[in-house]
Design a protein with these regions (language model features):
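A conserved mid-protein helix/loop that constitutes part of the nucleotide-sugar donor-binding site
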Residues: 17-22, 203, 207, 212-227
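A short, well-ordered alpha-helix in the C-terminal region of glycosyltransferases
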Residues: 333, 340-354, 363-366
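Conserved acidic donor-binding segment of nucleotide-sugar-dependent glycosyltransferases
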Residues: 313-324, 333-338
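Aromatic "clamp/platform" in nucleotide-sugar-dependent glycosyltransferases that forms part
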Residues: 262, 281
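A short helix/loop element that forms part of the nucleotide-sugar donor recognition site in Leloir-type
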Residues: 187-199, 340, 377, 381-384
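A short, active-site helix/loop in glycosyltransferases that binds the activated sugar's phosphate group
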Residues: 144-173, 181-185
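Short hydrophobic beta-strand element within catalytic cores of glycosyltransferases
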Residues: 298-301
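A conserved nucleotide-sugar
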Residues: 33, 199-203, 218-258, 336-339
Length: 396
């Protein structure tokens, strides 16, 4: 099978990029050829004998919106010239003007725009808010076209599939393939808090994510911390430009909130804390949640989560991501009852064992093969029909 992946990144260290990396790696391992049309591609894929990397952005471009437009144009131009070289073209959401056979849906921009927690509504007049609204509206408009033109859509969760269906997409076009996790990298083990300058004696929660904007919702965690005075929180995310250190000061919890910046040692960090808290206002299927579960951590998330339906006994889900009181009650429970914390962590790990990357990649490749087989059958039926017509005319 000759596969083209159209996406911004195929990268072991990136969220969606990691999904693309695992698909490409599994396809190459099965003997297929993979061409990546992207801004960045892992050398392991690009330098593989059956791998190829087409760079669709070679010049510096100032804003994400302009970068996306440039990428969409350049990738579409290349695909139009080379489309006949591929059996399957898969795109990640809207990334190219050229229609794809399969579109993977990691995020539904129009759903985020409609979300009551979308922070950039028309009541905000700042240039940054206007820009965020604009880029979300444009993405929402073109992703609808990308979804409708594809033969198949792969949603990363049932939650996401439901959002896509609101576009009027047939259920027959939709397949759910969950993201995965590396259970060898993320696993329970001895704590190494000293590596991060953290005390061994304190109950410790973990938050990982972008802390420059409000979507990941660190603010509610900080407010909840006021009601759980014995709990400390470690925050892993780029601190530069973030308002949250100042907010922690205002809420008088800064002495218990440890901003360690962005780190590549997430697996070690997860083995060093007691539970994971992530009340995001909108998520389709974040990898960090599965990584926490694979590490044997109880997880606490909001109901605005594509992954909330598989947490089960491995954590707690609360409805309103802005409800600091409800979150504080859950965190207090996890601090006070270590045995409950332990049993939830075991359940979380067991659930993660059923969601490994090998299963995710196999799910994508199965969709590719099913679509190809359906096309072969349609082509075969078409040839048979023409033969039947010819035979009928001969008999006459």
């Amino acid at each position: 099978m000759r596969i083209a992946l159209v996406t911004h990144k195929v990268d072991f260290q990136d969220g969606q990029g990691r999904v693309n990396y695992e698909i490409a790696k599994a396809a190459l391992d099965r003997g297929h050829s993979v061409t990546v049309i992207a801004e960045y591609c892992s050398s392991e894929i690009a330098n593989h004998p059956r791998g190829r990397f087409i760079c669709a952005r070679e010049i510096p471009i100032p804003t994400q919106l302009l970068r996306n437009i440039y990428f969409a144009e350049k990738s579409a131009r290349w695909l139009r010239q080379h489309r006949d070289e591929f059996d399957i073209i898969q795109a990640n959401g809207f990334v190219t003007w050229e229609p794809a056979d399969i579109v993977a849906v990691h995020f539904v921009h129009s759903a985020w725009l409609r979300n009551p927690f979308f922070p950039f509504h028309w009541s905000s007049f700042s240039p940054y808010a206007y820009y965020q609204r604009l880029i979300t509206i444009i993405n929402g408009h073109y992703e609808k076209k990308a979804f409708r033109s594809a033969d198949k859509l792969i949603a990363v969760s049932r939650f996401t599939a439901g959002e896509v269906a609101e576009y009027g997409i047939s259920q027959e076009k939709l397949v759910v393939v969950h993201n995965g996790v590396d259970i060898e990298e993320f696993h329970p083990g001895p704590a190494v808090r000293s590596e991060f300058g953290l005390s061994e004696e304190i109950p410790l929660a973990l938050f990982v994510g972008d802390i420059k904007t409000t979507r990941k919702n660190l603010e509610t965690v900080l407010k909840a911390m006021q009601s759980v005075p014995e709990l400390h929180l470690v925050v892993a995310g780029k601190v530069e430009g973030s308002p949250y250190p100042a907010i922690a000061e205002e809420l008088k919890v800064s002495d218990r909130v440890h901003f360690i910046g962005k780190t590549s040692k997430i697996a070690s960090l997860m083995r060093s804390v007691d539970f994971f808290v992530f009340p995001s206002r909108y998520e389709a299927h974040p990898l960090v949640l599965l990584e926490a579960m694979a590490s044997g951590l109880p997880v606490v998330v909001s109901g605005n989560f594509g992954a909330a339906d598989y947490i089960h006994a491995g954590g707690r889900v609360f409805d309103d991501p802005n409800d600091a009181s409800a979150l504080a009650t859950i965190m207090e429970e996890l601090v006070r009852f270590p045995e409950k914390r332990k049993s939830m962590g075991v359940a979380a790990r067991e659930q993660a064992l059923n969601m490994q990357w090998s299963q995710t990649a196999a799910g994508y490749l199965d969709v590719y093969e099913e679509l190809l087989e359906k096309r072969r059958q349609s082509a075969s039926a078409g040839h048979l029909s023409m033969d039947d017509v010819a035979n009928s005319q001969e008999k006459k």
